[in-house]
Amino acid sequence: NKLDEPYMKKFKFLKFSKSKKLRYSHNYFKERLYLVFLPGFMSDIEGKKPMCLLKFAKKKKLGFLSLEYSGHGKSSGFFTKGNISIWSNEAKAMIKKIIKKNNFILIGSSMGSWIALNQFKYFNSQIKGFIGIGSAPEFLKRLMWDKFPKKIKREIVTKGKAVIKNGKYEYPISYQLIKNGRENRVLNRKYNLKINVTMIHGKKDEVVPVSFSRLVLSKFIKAKKKLVL
């Protein structure tokens, strides 16, 4: 399933240091509202969601930005060396560099919603809306660690990581990732922005329960809220 050539040209790399470069796609406008898509755990920017959003942004003459965190897709780095703090900081740096002072709507998919919630403390005045798709903030504790059998937990602690099988997927889960997740609590805060917040969640989602999206909505006190199932 080869991507359309025009889209391939939209992928660029931003160099952060000698050893770190992140791949991103964007639709540039100097002074326009942007859509910022933050992908999920082990996802890249060649999936259907970022592609559809890029197409939509072009059609509506909106700015667009999506990135691959380190250890994801074609970005540099090792997945097992990354964590929520690192990936959140990469998203922050990319937004500052590409979007600058423009306003934007955050769109987070799965783990991307966790990364998105971490952006509110930096871009409160620029964020004009938030859309979550199958949102999974704090999933490392709630959906992984708390449910792992003792044997897996022991392996992660003693060896530093373990490969977790989930259906046809395999995830290398490191102990530093789990520990860092505990430092990135976002569901113990309240968000005071008067913006539109929409959570989209599949009723048949077997990985992330709908309760996660409801919980995210409950944290926005002054927002105009909507849950789409």
PLM features: what roles do these ranges have?
Residues 3-29:
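N-terminal cap/lid segment of alpha/beta-hydrolase-fold proteins
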Residues 50, 195, 209-218:
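Short alpha-helix in the alpha/beta-hydrolase fold that links the catalytic acid
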Residues 50, 54-76:
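Conserved alpha/beta-hydrolase
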Residues 73-98:
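Catalytic nucleophile-loop/oxyanion-hole region of alpha/beta-hydrolase
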Residues 108-116:
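Gly/Ala-rich beta-loop-alpha elbow adjacent to hydrolase catalytic centers
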Residues 125-173:
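Hydrolase active-site cap/lid region
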Residues 193, 199-201, 205:
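Short beta-strand/loop motif that positions the catalytic acidic residue
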Residues 218-229:
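Catalytic histidine neighborhood in serine/cysteine hydrolases
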